[in-house]
UniProtKB/Swiss-Prot annotation:
Protein source organism: Human adenovirus C serotype 5
Name of the protein described by the UniProt record: E1B protein, small T-antigen
Pfam families: Adeno_E1B_19K
GO BP annotations, alphabetical order: symbiont-mediated suppression of host apoptosis
A single GO cellular-component term on record: host cell nuclear lamina
Length: 176
């Protein structure tokens, strides 16, 4: 996912969504847009019909968003985004860019609010995915040593203490 490490920075996510939305002209995107924004636009155009079908399955998503309710958006959209591969991450960004374009046609809310709202949720989903991966990679199964292994470890510890030139009990009362 090295190609999409920019998704870990909120301002980069916001810029990517802004550059890949229909509010940015293709000419500006062609001259100054990032390669990722161009890729997201291409994915958005290629999968337009699939994205339309996904939005139809979400029911009254835009009505609830216009009223300020986020629960449906969280359940139906954000929790289903997949960032396991660079291609899936690009598709997730393209889907949110598609949602921004459709939502801006049907709302009274400002474009800046839409952009901030979607960028914040996308960024949080990426960070949550990364933290989940880090947590899973750090969890190791507990290895319970057998009695024989415990005895071997204890003997090895005693030998190291005896061979050590530094004696932590030096100057103390002798052992009984």
């Amino acid at each position: 996912m090295e190609a999409w490490e920019c998704l870990e920075d909120f301002s980069a996510v916001r810029n990517l969504l802004e550059q890949s939305s229909n509010s940015t002209s293709w000419f500006w995107r062609f001259l100054w847009g990032s390669s990722q924004a161009k890729l997201v636009c291409r994915i958005k155009e290629d999968y337009k019909w699939e994205f339309e079908e996904l939005l139809k399955s979400c029911g009254e998503l835009f009505d609830s968003l216009n009223l300020g309710h986020q629960a449906l958006f969280q359940e139906k959209v954000i929790k289903t985004l997949d960032f396991s591969t660079p291609g899936r991450a690009a598709a997730a960004v393209a889907f949110l860019s598609f949602i921004k374009d459709k939502w801006s046609e049907e709302t009274h809310l400002s474009g800046g609010y839409l952009l901030d709202f979607l960028a914040m949720h996308l960024w949080r989903a990426v960070v949550r995915h990364k933290n989940r991966l880090l947590l899973l990679s750090s969890v190791r199964p507990a290895i319970i040593p057998t009695e024989e292994q415990q005895q071997q470890q204890e003997e090895a510890r005693r030998r190291r203490q005896e061979q050590s030139p530094w004696n932590p009990r030096a100057g103390l009362d002798p052992r009984e």
